[in-house]
């Protein structure tokens, strides 16, 4: 087990102090509808209220603030499915650095556009996160840019851990946390923080049922590659990296379960958030709600926290989902 999971609560506090001028402490609100549905208090952690519309700003900010002035001056670079790129672009602009974001052609145009608005250089490369990562590594070697990975880095995970700390502070009796699972930065960070304070709390990762790289890797016992598909939960796409050094070990050790939801269930989560919670969520942000609505996670044994991780959905697509239209996605 990697030593990162055993970092002290003081280290989480240092990360929180480091980023507090740049990120919001997001609300944790009770969901009346989900509480009535499950018979258990369900509270929603509104991470989509962050300045860039997702939790990713925490880790990106924590990482860039620990670079030397000379490294910041040369610039930062990352591969991204959208939200990390937007967060890193925002954080770079805030400290006077420049960002280059490499993405595949699966990233929705609305996310690409928002990154460009923040002044970042955008490179669209290939049809997978792995293709984008190859371009990142090329530019690191050629231009001396500092790579800020989207999830598999101790500074990123430490920033995301502050979400877990805030959940426990706001809900001391938390018995279960549901959160989106992709590369594992959020899941590893939140799980480590919550279990440090509430060892018996269950942490459930939720992801889409097509191209679930972390689940496949946990089942195999080592990182594996999976095919990427278009999905309502587009920001959960991409692999975990065959040389994954941090999040795979932590997720395998700290997650109590990983649950898969399909496109229809993700759409139902988006609709529920809008109609009953008055929240606009992207697909990845709604997977925890989807898991409860579908009955794939039974909320019992105490209070449940659900992390709503992001809101950066194309509004045309959001209207289609609210109106009951689920776009067909590629099967091969």
UniProtKB/Swiss-Prot annotation:
Keywords: Amino-acid biosynthesis, Branched-chain amino acid biosynthesis, Isoleucine biosynthesis, Lyase, Plasmid, Pyridoxal phosphate. Its cofactor is pyridoxal 5'-phosphate. Belongs to the serine/threonine dehydratase family. It catalyses: L-threonine = 2-oxobutanoate + NH4(+). It is an enzyme of class 4 (lyase). The modification N6-(pyridoxal phosphate)lysine is found at residue 56. Its EC number is 4.3.1.19. The keyword Amino-acid biosynthesis applies. One of its GO terms (molecular function) is pyridoxal phosphate binding. CDD domains: Thr-dehyd. Disulfide bonds: none annotated. The keyword Repeat does not apply. InterPro entries: Ectoine_EutB (IPR014333), Ser/Thr_Dehydratase (IPR050147), Ser/Thr_deHydtase_PyrdxlP-BS (IPR000634), TrpB-like_PALP (IPR001926), TrpB-like_PALP_sf (IPR036052). GO terms for biological process: isoleucine biosynthetic process; L-serine catabolic process; threonine catabolic process. This is Putative threonine dehydratase. It comes from Sinorhizobium fredii (strain NBRC 101917 / NGR234). It comes from the Bacteria. Pfam families: PALP. Pathway: Amino-acid biosynthesis; L-isoleucine biosynthesis; 2-oxobutanoate from L-threonine: step 1/1.
């Amino acid at each position: 087990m990697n030593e990162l999971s055993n970092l002290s609560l003081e280290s989480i506090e240092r990360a929180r102090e480091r980023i507090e001028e740049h990120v919001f402490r997001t609300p944790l609100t009770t969901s009346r509808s989900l509480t009535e549905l499950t018979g258990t208090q369900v509270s929603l952690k509104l991470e989509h209220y962050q300045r860039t519309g997702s939790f990713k700003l925490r880790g990106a900010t924590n990482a860039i603030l620990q670079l030397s002035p000379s490294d910041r001056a040369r610039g930062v670079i990352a591969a991204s499915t959208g939200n990390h790129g937007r967060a890193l672009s925002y954080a770079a602009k805030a400290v006077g650095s420049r960002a280059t974001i490499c993405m595949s052609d699966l990233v929705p145009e609305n996310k690409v556009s928002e990154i460009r608005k923040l002044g970042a250089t955008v490179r669209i490369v290939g049809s997978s996160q792995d293709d984008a990562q190859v371009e990142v590594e090329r530019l690191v070697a050629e231009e001396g840019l500092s790579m800020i990975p989207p999830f598999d880095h101790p500074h990123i995970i430490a920033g995301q851990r502050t979400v877990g700390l805030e959940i426990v502070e706001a809900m001391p009796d938390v018995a279960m946390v549901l959160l989106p699972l992709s590369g594992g930065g959020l899941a590893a960070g939140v799980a480590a923080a919550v279990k440090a304070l509430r060892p018996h709390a269950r942490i459930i990762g939720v992801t889409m049922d097509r191209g679930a790289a972390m689940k496949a890797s946990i089942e195999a016992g080592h990182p594996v590659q999976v095919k990427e598909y278009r999905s309502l939960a587009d920001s959960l796409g991409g692999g975990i990296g065959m040389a994954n050094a941090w999040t795979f070990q932590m997720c395998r050790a700290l997650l109590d379960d990983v649950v898969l939801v399909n496109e229809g269930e993700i759409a139902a989560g988006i609709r529920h958030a809008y109609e009953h919670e008055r929240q606009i969520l992207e697909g990845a942000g709604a997977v925890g709600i989807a898991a409860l609505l579908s009955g794939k996670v039974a909320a019992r044994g105490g209070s449940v926290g659900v992390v709503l991780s992001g809101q950066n959905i194309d509004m045309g697509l959001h209207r289609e989902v609210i109106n009951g239209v689920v776009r067909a996605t590629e099967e091969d």
